[in-house]
């Protein structure tokens, strides 16, 4: 295997404080040329998955990583679709307010099939975390003709606290087409087909009875009734689909079709955007998790900044929020006053001690810049981290808070499927 060459150029230390600025938003749709690097962890089916964006298709590598280089990204709505044999399809939506190195974090759910039944008799399955009931003679062919043969059913309970397993970006639209920020309390996926792969559906006026167990640590915030949402794979958003009623530690509802169904807390939403920076204004290159906090507890906590520190996400509307950025083992908070419309927060400075920024270049054995690749960084005191290489260059933040910390950098060239020895 040919070796890649990695050149380390710069090592800096920064300290910072938190400050937030507001700016007037714009409603005009703008397209930016961006880099996209997505990660589908191998334990979430990430190896060899097919990823599509705007008519371009690629595949995840042995670490579940994929890249789209110099692609046009909308300031309003973008959709990435991920498929793999034996897994449920995954869809992620995102947006940007600048040319960015965008990070997409997702996962695939393995199909659990074998719950088949005869449509003439129906089915009643009672599990520990979810249950479903199909009434007899409630299924038809796509043409509307009654279907009474075998139904091949795949069903799955999805942990509402596992953000990589839940499709979309936790945004839904109600019946009036208003956007809402969602927090799942339970998610069920159902998929069915007839003999020989026949397309079948629920008959008009027939429903499936669903119930889902509410996690113990979410019971205190679970209301007596909640909006039921189904996932729209065409738009990448959840859609209002009914009401679920709480019965003890469960939510129960009737639905008219199979698919992804979510029992979600919801707040009317507005777009916020900004940029995380260090004290001197340089970007925070390593993505940090974003928590939206109301009162003393996190309510929405499923976002992440991009590889260049930028973010553009949905947040609860007209509510005082604390935005917590988890980075380097510590939490950095920025308070946000009520946003009744799209808010641009400007630069948010993070208080990061012991931080060092490393920049460098990656070239192949012919001394040509690696156009599409990434750096695998390992250290003796942190998990494995992946950093994008863009036009032969990379930027990384390392949180050196322990004496004796050692980091190794492994450059990977995606286009030529090459990996070098560590530097």
Q: For each of these PLM feature ranges, what is it?
A:
Residues 13-16:
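C-terminal motif of bacterial Sec signal peptides marking the signal peptidase cleavage site
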Residues 20-27, 63, 103-125, 178-183, ...:
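Proteolytic cleavage junctions
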Residues 53, 73-97, 320-340, 399-423:
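A short, solvent-exposed loop/turn motif at the edges and junctions
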Residues 130-207:
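Long, contiguous ectodomains of secretory-pathway proteins
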Residues 48-53, 94, 153, 228, ...:
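Hydrophobic beta-strand segments
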Residues 50-67, 294-316, 380-397:
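Short, acidic Ser/Thr/Gly-rich low-complexity loop/linker segments typical of extracellular
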Residues 25-50, 273-287, 359-372:
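Structural motif
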Residues 18-128, 141-145, 160, 164, ...:
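Acidic/polar, low-complexity intrinsically disordered N-terminal segments immediately downstream
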